[in-house]
Design a protein with these regions (language model features):
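Short, glycine- and charge-enriched coil/turn segments that flank and shape catalytic ligand pockets
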Residues: 22, 27, 73-77, 106-109
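Short amphipathic alpha-helical segments
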Residues: 43, 83-84, 145
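Short beta-strand-initiation
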Residues: 3, 82, 130-132
Length: 170
């Protein structure tokens, strides 16, 4: 038997007294930011867990880099869809972008494609053919909306779909 335990995190916007600087803090303790990571106060930026989901270290690192670029006058914006998530199980589970439920809730007309790893020469050669890859596409623009991968090294493979989303591939 195996058990996966995931622990939660809580934002601390009130604990750091961000309101004293005029920064808006939600009831839950998050600090809202726009896609350039700006708070409601000019020249105050927010990054990391305190600005909301997903609460992942690699998201915070990416946000910090983007905030520095924006402060330096470069054109940059944060798109949470490009932050992948991975469950380090066996086999691994990785996903990024929109899920089917999110696409439906947003009224997006989408199509999906899936590929079973039992048909993958690489997976068969590795002796690990359990798994699959699933992609969601906008039905009209044919642009990638999201991806999910279950299988060995899924956490590494998901980065290829992130690149496709960032580049606006269709």
């Amino acid at each position: 038997d195996r058990i996966l335990v995931a622990v939660g995190r809580r934002p601390n916007g009130h604990a750091i007294e961000a309101e004293n600087a005029g920064v808006h803090v939600t009831k839950q303790g998050f600090i809202p930011v726009d896609n350039q990571l700006r708070t409601n106060v000019p020249n105050i930026f927010g990054i990391g867990d305190i600005v909301g989901e997903p609460m992942l270290a690699h998201k915070a690192t990416h946000e910090g880099k983007l905030a520095a670029e924006i402060i330096a006058g470069q054109k940059a914006a944060f798109d949470v869809r490009t932050i992948p998530s991975v469950a380090y199980t066996d086999p691994e589970i990785a996903w990024m972008g929109l899920t089917e439920i999110e696409a439906k809730n947003q009224g997006i007309d989408y199509e999906k494609a899936s590929f079973p790893w039992a048909a993958s020469g690489r997976a068969i050669a590795m002796g690990r053919d359990e798994g699959m890859t699933k992609l969601l596409f906008d039905k009209n623009t044919r642009r990638l909306l999201g991806a999910g991968i279950v299988g060995i090294n899924a956490g590494e493979l998901i980065s290829e779909t992130v690149l496709a989303l960032e580049m606006g591939t269709d």
